[in-house]
Amino acid sequence: DLYKGEILGIVGESGSGKSVNVLSITNLIRPPGKIINGEIIYNNTDILSLNTNDLRKIRGNEISNIFQDPLSSLNPVLKIGKQIIESILKHLKLNNINAKKRTINLINNVGIPSAEERYINYPHQFSGGMRQRIMISIGLSCDPKILIADEPTTALDVTIQAQIVNLIEKLKIQYNMSIIWITHDLGLLAGLADRIIVMYAGRIMEEANVTEIYEDPKHPYTK
C-alpha cells in the first residue's frame, strides 16, 4: 500500500527486485520480462487491466518516474525545454505559449537559475546535479499524484545528493504527492521515509514504519 502524502522507501541490495517491482506499476517492464499475475490497484482501478491508451493517461501524468541516470535518460540532441514540455502538451492540453510558461516555472521551481535562458540548453550543458533537477521537473510536469524516484541520487556526490533529497522533500509538500523512493542506502531513508519495505530476491522480507525498522528490525536480512 501507498498512502497519500507519504514517502515509502524500498531498500535492498542490487538485483533484489526493487526497480522491477516499481516499473511494473506503470507496465514499463522490458521484454522478455512480463507480469504473470496479480493486480495493481490505483484509484479503485486495476492498472494491469487497462488498455494502452488508458494506461498512457496515467503514466507520466498521474504516476511519474525519476530515473537513476539523468544523462542516459535525457535525449542528448533535444533542448531540455522541449523534453519537459512534451508531457505537458500531451496530458494537460495547454497551448504552446502556456505550456512554455509552465515549463519555465518548473525549471525555476527545481532550483535552476535563469530558467528562461536554460530552456534552450542541451543536456550536456548541465552538470550531473542540474541534469537530475531537469529529470525532476519532467517528473513533476503534470502534477502527479505519485512520484517514483528510482535511486535518483546514486550518480551524484554527497553534497549534491543532500540538495536533491531536500528539493524532493520540499516539492512533495508543494505538489501534495506521494513518493516511492528506491535505494540501497538505508542511512538515506532514515531521515526521509515514513515507511520502509526491505526486499531480497524479488520478495518483501519486512515492511514497517521507519522507527520500527531501525529500532526493532524483525527479519534477519534487515538486521
Describe the residue ranges of each PLM region.
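P-loop NTP-binding/switch modules centered on Walker-like glycine-rich loops
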Residues: 13, 27, 148, 152, ...
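Conserved ABC ATPase "signature" region
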Residues: 46, 86, 97-117
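ABC ATPase NBD coupling module
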Residues: 47-64, 90, 212-217
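Q-loop/switch helix immediately C-terminal to the Walker
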Residues: 76-89
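Conserved ABC ATPase signature
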Residues: 121-126, 130
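A short, proline-enriched helix->beta-strand linker immediately N-terminal to the Walker B motif
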Residues: 141-145
